[in-house]
């Protein structure tokens, strides 16, 4: 059964190698075109069936049934300067595509159910043509399947979503002494999310908890770490998240504010790389008419990685060269056009301005240390088609 599911997910991911998302750390800023158009905001504001991906309690806003499917084109721009005088090298991991499908239906006066598949996280670089950067290629991909079940009474909704997560990780490089790497490793594990929402007058408040999911990628981190003199396990957990959100609707306008914490310090693997917890703030605005809607948003979280100093130069190298999660600000705009009462089209664009970090890093054991610099910016274009029936 696991092999069958893995094959299905690999087929979906074949649309594009997901090597870098518009991200807080390695977690997507948002999932779905409506949420992305508001920079990920959606814990306290319903986006229809798409809410299954953000706060499953809010799928109770649909009238009958709704299906949304689409995808996001991610275009990261990453470079690394190893401090040896040759100048920066650009990562070739500059385009990826992730599909998204979300379905929700009202099955009784109080009970709603859905199903969805969506990419949730990813990060990586591709320096295979840069020997000075060890020809390093890293690629983390995560995708989830979920079945949200929600119950609504009066203005209160509660939901739980059992999750099945597929993950793949590939780390390979050549430090000049031969290839290091074990090919792509995959895993399939379970988790869950819990959502709550309450509507009172023009306000909606929401809360969501997403469980940590422990993933094990055979021989990936241990093999890569050993080459840098590090002793690492092969677990790389998807971190737990806790979020709160509120929205206020007045006329055609809605303003929404979300806060969530991403628990990197408790996540296996990320603890070894010294990642810090992130406090994420998202602010979104929507103007909606019967035929169209426009959205704006801003998302901010400080980088989870930091300079670990001269005692941890190998960790600095792995973070900056392989997993440069340094982007902090995200600006978004989006919209919806309603072709009819049954059919609509969503679009969103997210831009993350360039961030730059310089750490003391090690090229390889016994080769000394030097200052290395990574620059990273991101842009993403998301589209979706929605059907109500």
Task: List each model region and its residues.
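Gram-negative bacterial Sec-dependent N-terminal signal peptides
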Residues: 1-22
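Alpha-helical transmembrane segments and their juxtamembrane interfaces
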Residues: 13-16, 65, 156, 292
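Transmembrane beta-strand segments of Gram-negative outer membrane beta-barrel proteins
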Residues: 27-42, 60-77
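Residue-level detector of alpha-helical secondary structure
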Residues: 37, 51-58, 68, 384
């Amino acid at each position: 059964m696991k092999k069958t599911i893995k094959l299905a997910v690999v087929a979906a991911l074949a649309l594009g190698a997901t090597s870098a998302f518009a991200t807080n750390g390695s977690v997507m800023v948002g999932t779905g075109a409506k949420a992305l158009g508001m920079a990920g905001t959606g814990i306290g504001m319903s986006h229809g069936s798409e809410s299954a991906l953000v706060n499953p309690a809010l799928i109770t806003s649909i009238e009958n049934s709704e299906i949304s499917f689409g995808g996001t084109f991610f275009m990261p721009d990453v470079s690394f300067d190893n401090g040896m005088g040759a100048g920066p090298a650009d990562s070739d991991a500059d385009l990826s595509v992730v599909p998204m499908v979300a379905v929700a239906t009202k099955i009784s006066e109080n009970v709603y159910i859905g199903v969805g598949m969506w990419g949730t996280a990813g990060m990586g670089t591709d320096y295979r043509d840069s020997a000075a950067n060890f020809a390093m290629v890293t690629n983390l991909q995560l995708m989830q399947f979920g079945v949200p079940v929600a119950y609504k009474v009066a203005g209160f909704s509660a939901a739980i979503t059992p999750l099945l997560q597929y993950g793949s990780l590939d780390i390979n490089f050549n430090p000049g002494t031969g290839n290091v790497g074990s090919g792509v490793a995959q895993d399939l594990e379970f988790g869950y999310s819990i959502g709550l929402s309450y509507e009172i007058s023009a306000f909606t408040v929401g809360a969501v908890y997403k469980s940590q999911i422990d993933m094990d990628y055979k021989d990936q981190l241990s093999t890569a770490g050993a080459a840098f003199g590090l002793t690492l396990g092969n677990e790389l957990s998807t971190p737990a998240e806790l979020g709160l959100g509120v929205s206020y609707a007045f006329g055609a306008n809605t303003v929404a504010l979300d806060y969530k914490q991403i628990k990197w310090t408790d996540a296996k693997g990320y603890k070894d790389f010294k990642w810090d917890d992130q406090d994420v703030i998202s602010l979104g605005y929507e103007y909606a008419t019967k035929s169209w809607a426009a959205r704006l948003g801003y998302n901010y979280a400080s980088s989870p990685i930091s300079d670990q100093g001269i005692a941890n130069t190998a960790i600095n190298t792995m973070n900056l060269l392989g997993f440069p999660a340094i982007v902090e600000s995200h600006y978004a705009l989006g919209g919806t056009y309603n072709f009819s009462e049954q059919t609509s089209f969503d679009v969103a664009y997210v831009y993350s301005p360039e961030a730059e970090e310089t750490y003391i890093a090690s090229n390889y054991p016994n080769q000394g240390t030097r200052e290395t610099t990574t620059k990273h910016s991101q842009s993403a274009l998301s589209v979706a088609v929605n059907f109500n029936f």
